[in-house]
Each structure stands twice: as structure tokens, then as C-alpha cells.
Curated annotation (Swiss-Prot):
Localisation: Plastid, Chloroplast
Protein name, entry field: DNA-directed RNA polymerase subunit beta
Cellular component per GO, a single term: DNA-directed RNA polymerase complex
Main localization (coarse): plastid
Amino acid sequence: MLQNGNEGMSTIPGFSQIQFEGFCRFINQGLTEEFHKFQKIEDRDQEIEFQLFVETYQLVEPLITERDAVYESLTYSSELYVPAVLIWKTGRNMQEQTVFIGNIPIMNSFGTSIVNGIYRIVINQIVQSPGIYYRSELEHNGVSVYTSTIISDWGGRSELEIDRKARIWARVSRKQKISILVLSSAMGSNIREILDNVCYPEIFLSFPNDKEKKKIGSKENAILEFYQQFACVGGDPVFSESLCKELQKKFFQQRCELGKIGRQNLNRRLNLDIPQNNTFLLPRDLLAAVDHLIGMKLGMGTLDDMSHLKNKRIRSVADLLQDQFGLALVRLENTVRGTICGAIRHKLIPTPQNLVTSTSLTTTYESFFGLHPLSQVLDRTNPLTQIVHGRKWSYLGPGGLTGRTASFRIRDIHPSHYGRICPIDTSEGINVGLMGSLAIHVKVGYWGSIESPFYGLSERSKEAQMVYLSPNRDEYYMVAAGNSLALNRDIQEQQVVPARYRQEFLTIAWEEIHLRSIFPFQYFSIGASLIPFIEHNDANRALMSSNMQRQAVPLSRSEKCIVGTGLEGQTALDSGVSVIAECKGKIIYTDTQKIFLSSNGDTLSIPLVMYQRSNKNTCMNQKTQVQRGKYIKKGQILAGGAATAGGELALGKNVLVAYMPWEGYNFEDAVLISERLVYKDIYTSFHIRKYEIQTHVTSQGPERITKEIPHLEARLLRNLDRNGIVMLGSWIETGDILVGKLTPQTASESSYAPEDRLLRAILGIQVSTSKETSLRLPIGGRGRVIDVRWIHRRGVSNSNPERIRVYISQKREIKVGDKVAGRHGNKGIISKILSRQDMPYLQDGTPVDMVFNPLGVPSRMNVGQIFECSLGLAGDLLKKHYRIGPFDERYEQEASRKLVFSELYEASKKTKNPWVFEPEYPGKSRIFDGRTGDLFEQPVLIGKSYILKLIHQVDDKIHGRSSGHYALVTQQPLRGRAKQGGQRVGEMEVWALEGFGVAHILQEMLTYKSDHIRARQEVLGAMIIGATVPNPESAPESFRLLVRELRSLSLELNHFLVSEKNFQMDRKEA
């Protein structure tokens, strides 16, 4: 029934496999395909010929390591060499050399590329697959109009449609449409060939009139008519060779090149047998498409679902890199042709190495990785973030959709997404449904199809054989779900099972099943697969949890979860943050920086990552997990990375939580925590910030790094060494100088001292002064200096400045304002840190660590946190760890609840604590108020939950403005923390202040602290001398701006003062 080409896969495929396979396909096949498109280059007189021998190209191993590339801000790339030959046809001489084409960035062990010292990743793009698609639309009068859309390999679209008069038109753009007969004739078919190759010749003969028959009488007339309508030119154009070339370039190459994928889809849809290497639209294709369209009009055939994954394909890293390589070769071809012409003009003898430059390829890839929307900076907040980023897909980008034009139908979940695209994990906001994650078992096929594995059941023995199926194949089979997902194949299957067939969900007999799903997590992404009891959560909360797990900060002391799903180990392994033994051997030495391993008589040095900064300022560190003298096996973990524990992903901590109100401090999702989490460093994390300064060569001379900076206090320079750079290990406070720098500048004539003017007048010496441009530590950046890097420029070019980078580590304990979250979308802000003795405590005297709002559970419908909380308590008491797959109700009803209650009952018996499981209110317990020692009135749900500390921390968000910059036009303070901006007092805030009657505060907000220029200056002077702050008398700048705006509209705004005594009007201008 099914061909099995994927036997033997017993584990989940590597999570970074898609990136690796894509890059290998680019190196092995993509380069060769683009090289074969490189044509011979000749001069105008055809005397010199240049060509490349593309069969023997060579990629050299990178000259630097990944660590050096990151450290020195270089690109981790490989040099590409190709043999080239230059032939002089007149003298029959030939010169062959190996030329350097350029550098190609190489993928590293994380599945990413290092460009200019930055980890970058290319995400997958889902685009409409080239081919032909049929659809119908209702007009305003209720008549159906059938159209077919031909999508080229470059994204160009051409439409065929039948109007109400049964006339067939080809629409090459939104405005122009042309008769199908004219288009067919312009493509080379005459009227007799058209009528002989269609199924409905009477329809073709019915609509052309005498004028149209004249247009299609010859190919030249058809081309002229088509060109006149397509290019929208007036008059009567004359047929010429240049006109044909222009039409070929503008229309046929852009809109009629199908590519290999488009040719395959067109043959399959129209039942054609045209060879695969014929990648352009032929007249035969056009006539077959019209026949099919007429059949649709007559009620035959099926319409296409544009949202189905069989009509889409993935542009992976292989396709994107191959497109850029082809673009670079086109630029190289133009450069070589221009160089040959220049050499002949100047009567020089060129060589292949002189003709070829590496600029085209190098700059093309640097531009792609730096500017392309699908090339993104790798998010390295934690290991999960790294690995999920490489499995993202997007409808956005060049050739795709935009967030504002994408319809709801495109964003919605489609039945063909089953097992291929995660229905949970997607972006929030304007890009919802346009970006998401691939399911964990997905494989990208050769043609860009998203393939998912199934167990194919043979007709005789019903034995399972694993097969990968594309979306256009599995809809023809009955795919079982539900109870058939049991991992134990020996379980007797029921007679009737739920199944999926042709995008419909049915209930059929087991004997009719063709395929069955292979794993309970098959249809989820990595983020969603790490949520225990996800089947008990609302999908919106599961989406939030998938996104928030990627925002978790690695803690100083990692702890793996008590309740998990079983994928934590592979996630940590595939992320690459842990060090894995590549061979067996004996550990002979370990420290914090390296491990020495003796294997087969050789000693291997394995370096470890120490306090490396991620682009989210989190700390990536590796800790040794093996001891000296121990023997290890291949694949054993030598050192654990950040946010890992025991080889498993460990993003948070197991803490004792209670769901109860407490004095309003957990109102609206606020969280009350114990001070134990602070002084025991349970949620302490390290953050590393980078500060950089560059030295340039100015017109007045080079900038200098020095400690000798005049007119500065000595305390600001106390941490600098003799070179003017901060010393390692120094404790730095806000405002301290990290790097001392002086920039030379020429002073004005009036600022010279008398002796300087004398030297200048007598000796002509130009006296220069220096401006202090040192690197200072900004507000909120206090910490310990852990690394200083002085990166010198390579070569003598002044465009490459020297850079000095200072890395400062901060130790952040959890505090009020930090954001915490569980794995079920239950998030909140720390509202108060309570002393340990005031926290509610259990019947055995254990104080609670966190108090959550119980009202956050029923309305959000994320009941999975209740199961995790209770099972976590049982696991903590029994010293167990649970790994539970989703949808355990496939075994029996209420399986989750039975498991939790049985474990709580066992924990109650084993620990002899009856309060752990009380039949009257299972899962709940009577706890005491820490302040009074009294019992709370109602039993409270308590347990151990796995809570994460997120990257949204109050230290990065808190901000206060004392003075700062003002906008030039409105003279109001700027907005934003980065600009030392202020907080806007809007209309509703003014109402609030008016409601309290605080007139003086309101006046300050609208004048001194806003845009009253004169009042600001007077307030500053009064504060310095200690005088009374004067009241503002004139209008603020915003009012003056309004007056100027009205004047620009020829409207004059004045006000008049009327005296009560003599009723005279004194006019004063605003």
C-alpha cells in the first residue's frame, strides 16, 4: 500500500535538523545548480572568452574558530575557489587559474551563522507554491465567475477567467486583460493548432469577431496586439526584434517561468506529461488550463483550497542562500564583462585572477544576513529560545504577505496543519497566524513540502511501518487519532476510532484505518510540548505559555521540574548548550574553563563557556558535571549549560504555592512572594551588559585612549589602568568612566590663551584642544567588570576603527515589579515581598513561597496548573519526578484527576500526613495565617508549581527624569527611557488631577515640567539661589505653536482685554 523509506526511526528527530539539512542541500546541490547557470562571457568582438569550471569548485575550511569570530566581530565563513579559464580565440591561447570567488558564511553547531560576530539565523518562509489554482467568486448579481491563477516561480501571477458571455480572457495584471486567443498566438500557436488541442473548440470559435480574427491571423500581429495592451502604449507599434526581447523580458521571464516545482504541480493538476526540465509555460499548458477552466464552468472538476498546505511550500535556508548566490553570480558576470572591456580598451592583458573579485559574493551575503527580513538575530534568552527560533516559519517577507493585508482565512488553522504546523504556538498581535512553529516531527521535503510521519498499517498483518507523507498524499488515507495514539502497540484497539479523511474528522471502524499517528506530541511545537496537562488548558493560555517559556531567564541555580512531559532532555541536548562527550575515555583534569579527556592515547582539551553574554543580556555559562579520574562513555554529558540540570531543560524553580487572596496584594494577577526567595537566591540571575566605544581618525588627528583627562574628578577615574581602560574585577557605579578618550578639535580664535596666540603668531603653530568623549556607565548599569576586549583594526584602513568593549555583570535578585509566570499562561507581577514569618504556612509549619489569585483560574480556563500544582506536591513528598504526555484521557476517562489523587493519597500514607489528601476537599488543605496563627476559614489549594522568572524585569523598565532633552518643535520632553524622556500627562490624567483639586501640581505639570521655556529657566535660577518659585505669566510653547499653525492657515488669533471702567479694548497679541 505504502512505500516505506524511513524505517528505524525510534526517537524524535533532532530539533535543529531542518536547518542542518537545508544548509547541506545548499552546499551540495544549490551551488552546483547556480554555477551551471553561469554562462560564458565574451567581449564585444568575441575575441576573448571567460568561463568557470564549476564541477571542481572547492570550499576551504574556515580560517578562524567560532569563538574567535564572536570575540573579534568577524564572519565565520569559508573561502570559495573555482577553476577559471581565459581563452584568446585569435591566437588560440588559453590561461587557466584557480580564482577566489568570495566568502560564504558557514553554519555552526547551533544551526546558525556568525556574521560580524553576531549569531544570525534564517527562518523558514511559507509561500504559495508555483502552479495553477482554480477558484470561483460570486458577483453582485449572484453569478459565479470561474478563474484560474498561474503563479510563476518568481511570484508573478497571471489569471484566466470566463465572463458571463462565455468569453475567455487572460489577465496579466490587475488592469489589463487580453483575449486568450491573442495570448496563445503570441506564444507561437496558430488558430488551427489551438482548435486541434482543446476539448471545447466550439467555445473558442464562438467569441472572436472579425477584428479579433485579424489580430490572431499571424504571430506578428498577435505579438503587436499583446504588446500594445500589456505595455499600455498608444499608436501603432511596429514589429521588431527589440520589441520581442522587451516582451520576453517583462512578461514571459517573470510571469511564465514555473521552475521545477511549478512544472511538477502543473503536470499533476492538468494531467500533462511535459518533461521536468521544461520549466517555462508552454502554449500546451495554457490550452490545457483553459480546458480545465471550461470544465469547471460546466460543473466538472474540483476547486482548489488556497489555504491547504499542499498548495504551499517552504523556502528554507537552502532556497534563500541559493537565491543570493545566483544574484552574486549575476553581479560577478557583469563585473567580469566590464573588466574585460576595460582591459581591451586600455590594451592590457587580463588574467582570470585579475578579472574576478570577491566583492560581489561577500557583499551580497553580508547584505542578506544584515538586511533581509528573514535573517534575524538569534534570540538566546535561554536554550529553548535558541532551538525554537530555528524552527519558526513565517508568511511574511519578500514574496510573502504583510501583516496588514493578510486575511483572517490565511491566519486561521487548517485541517492540513495536522502534524505539520503547531496550532498553538504563534505570535500575538498583528502577526497572529502569520508566524509560528513547526511540529516536532516535521521534515522538509526536497520540493519544499512539509512532511509528517505516520505509521502505515499493512493490509495483511496490520504491522506499523513508518512513512513520511506530504500534505497532498495523506488526505487520501484514513488517519487514526484518539485512542489509537496509545504508545503501547499491544493494547487491543477498539472497534470504532476517530479518524481524519479528506480534511474531515470522522468515526470509522478500525479495519478501515490506513495510517495512525506515531506520537502524542506529533501535532505540537517544542514550546507547546513542554506544557504538562496542556489538554486541560484553553488554547489562548497555552499560546501565552509557549511564548513565555522563551522569555524565561536562566537562574544561577537551575532545578528541573517535578512535573514534565518528557521532552526536556532532548530539548536541552539539541540546544547545544551542554558539552557532550564525542568519544569514551578518562577525565584527567577539570576546572571552570576546560576539561582534559584522555581517549585512545590522545589528550583532548574541551573548552567551556564562562560568563558569555547573550543578545538579551542573559548569562550563558557551563558547569562541569564530571569528576577527575572518572571514566565516561560516548554521549555522556561533561558539562551542563545555562538553564539545564541533570541533562534536562530547567527554566524555573519548584516552589510551594497557594491559591488564596491575601490583603489585596494578589489583585489582578499580582503575586505575593516570601523573602526566602530573595535571601536564598532561589530566583537570582546574572545579567551581562556590553558597553562599546570606538576610536576614529578625525581631520584634526586620531582620538586617544588615555587616563590623563583634565577637569575630571579623581573618583571618576579611580578604576582606570594606565592605558585609560577600566580594570578587570572593578565594581562600577553609575557615572563612572569605563574608557577615557580624548577627541582632538581646533579651538576658536577667542578661546586661545594669550601665550597660545603668541606661539601661533610667531611660529605658526596650530594649537589644538581636546574634547573629552569618554565612555561612561549609564543609569542602572552598576556591576562588576568581567571582561575587557580591545579589538584592533585589521590592516591600515581608517574605515575600520579600533573598538573597546567592556562587559559588566549584574546580580539581580527577584524584587517587586519583576514578572513571573507558570507553564499554563498564569503570569503576574511581584506586588510585595513578605517576611517568612508572615506568610501563610502549612500544617507541618512550612511557609508558602508564593500566593496566587484563585480568581485567575476559572475565567482563564487553564486548569492544567491545578493538576501540576497538586501532582508537584505529591512528587516533592515522594521524591519522584513525573513525565506525562498530553491527552492521557485516551486511556480512560478522568485519567489526569485519578493520577493526581492517587499520588496525593500515596504521599499522605507514606509521610503520615493526613492533610496532604483529605477526602472532603481533595487537593486542598487548611492552612494558617502567619501573622496571627489562626486558621483560614476555607481550605486552600496548595502544591508545588514550576514557576519561571521572565526577562521583563523592573530594573530594565523603571525610569525617572530629573532633566533631559526637549523636542525642538513643541519644546516638550522627549518620550522613552532611552532618551531620558518624561511621562506624558494626557487629557484623562489632567481630569484626574482636577478631580483632586491639586491646582499647583497641575500648573507645574503643564508649565514648568512641560513646554514653558521662560518658566523653566526661572525655576532653575530660583532653586539655585533658594528664592520663591515664580508663577508663569506668558503662554506655554504649545499654545504658541497652535497660533503659528493657525497663521499658516491664514487665521489670526488674538485676545482682547476689556476695562470695566471705560469699556476700552486693549488689544494684545497672543
